[in-house]
């Protein structure tokens, strides 16, 4: 294609070697500045992809298996549409002779148009984290939160990161040492989709394979999505003895250990861990080891030793309980000002968690410290060299950055700072004008910004060189939980501003590096990022608000009909976190007044574990597998449980092992050609059928009542086993 063969005139660009070997092997050192970028096709396909992915991902977010449809689906799907538009759209110019002159069809569909469309799609595929705030307040706390402040919070949390991206782009994008490994997958896919495709021995192109996969997965999802929902979670062990609590605990894929449980549903497989087809085998192996260690060693051991009164509660649950084993009525300990009612809390008693939930919180602590120490121990020397090269006065400019600076105008820093200033002003306005609904004081917004400013370059260097990014959610919850306790909405707003603004800035920086690799004009990339983010936020907010009005008892598992998919597991965990860190506070949970203070030792364990692996690799250099142990991945594997359950892991691991090991090893050519295309087709087909089923049948409550839609068949998996505990629907020992 023209984009990859028309080189700039300076011969040194062909001779200069990229600092990172992977970049040298993957990214072309060529550019065609005349290639179409901002076109009618780009706007139509980009905004359509952004809105569609935003709607689908928010739609799935409230479901039991919240499938995330990645931008890869759109990245592949728009190729034939783009080529079709290049053939059929008129080529005449509109408003010719004016500054607004444009043509709907500037020629062949270009790679640069495709990259910008994918940037729009990235905005739609990345969840708007602040929708959790809307769900927690309106659906769980049953309190008032108007649409305007909710929308403003969503917009500001998503866009605030532009400020940090502008401040640190010189250090985290321009240097060759900052190579952002995940972008190389995107670059490879762009090249595969645009460079001339030789006929394969299977007689089918990537686009044809994508269409076949999409139609097949679309048709198949009619079974697990409507006609035969038991395929979502097949827990056959429970069928042997459905009234035995022990058998139910062992066999339930949704509320137990999930031994032998599996799902024949793509949304079950890919909902929490992402597509198993995109996971490297070493990462899948670490996830498998972590899952088996936590689920089949630590959890049974803690439960049957009755640690933290484990038998009084379900073996697996993300809910909160009182000491007697009944579900905690959080609304009963909130006063009229939406703060903790201390007297009511003293009468109700402390908040209790299932031991599994407590352990996974500990694993979250450990993952944070392990991520930092793993990178320092295993990548410290290279990291220091790369950081000095990036932040030093004599930093060497990357060859691709040289090409960009030669051919295109930079984005002025004041563009980024203007967005930051406007955002900060809006945030202060929200904090003051909507104080009773948001609770966050203005100084809390500034503190959240300071945390994000401090951690963005640190985490950014780690992410740009190792593809690992420790989250800030626990740190932010801890800080505001002590600084401004007993205010749940303030806690989750602070967490979102501190954590998500940093996370978003890393996304923006990653996209800027992708633009450098693919030679997208920086100002055009900036425009696509800003517009895509705003469109995505509006689409996410509108979809969430519509679903709240459309679905009766959304997220309320006590009132939803049996087998309902609208259980909102992710929002439930977010709500519980707001209770633990915000309403009750870390001091009453993990501090000197809390029952779970020993969980803090996980911070220490997470810091020590990478050092032990490093020592083992030095003591036994011939054991190559030791160096493949990645502690943050291993112990962080189950940090998403809950809301993820055992069946999500067992099903995912099987698929990851098949495609990441067997197919990759023994059918490498097929894997290279079709693996990511298969993943994108499965995402898209499942997503489209799910929405169609809802609009055509489930919205009108048209259901089929038969045993295939009666759930997994583990009715007592959530029952306690302690003596004398009375829970509705459970036997008393």
UniProtKB/Swiss-Prot annotation:
GO terms for cellular component: membrane. It comes from the Eukaryota. GO terms for biological process: pollen sperm cell differentiation; protein transport. GO terms for molecular function: oligopeptide transmembrane transporter activity. It is found in: Membrane. Keywords: Membrane, Peptide transport, Protein transport, Transmembrane, Transmembrane helix, Transport. It is a multi-pass membrane protein. Pfam families: OPT (PF03169). InterPro entries: Oligpept_transpt (IPR004648), OPT (IPR004813). The chain crosses the membrane at residues 42-62, 66-86, 115-135, 147-167, 209-229, 244-264, 281-301, 357-377, 413-433, 442-462, 531-551, 596-616, 644-664, 677-697. Its main location: membrane. May be involved in the translocation of tetra- and pentapeptides across the cellular membrane in an energy-dependent manner. Belongs to the oligopeptide OPT transporter (TC 2.A.67.1) family. This is Oligopeptide transporter 8. The gene is OPT8.
